[in-house]
Amino acid sequence: NRTFKTNTKCHVKNQCNFLCQ
């Protein structure tokens, strides 16, 4: 799930951080 669009420092590898949603 690519929920991180502009959040580059909020994604971990290929996994999106739930804290950043």
Curated annotation (Swiss-Prot):
Chief location category: secreted
Entry GO terms, CC: extracellular region
Tissue localization of expression: Expressed by the venom gland.
Keywords from the named record: Secreted
Domain of life the protein comes from: Eukaryota
Protein location: Secreted
Listed name of the protein: Venom peptide Ocy4
Organism the protein comes from: Opisthacanthus cayaporum (South American scorpion)
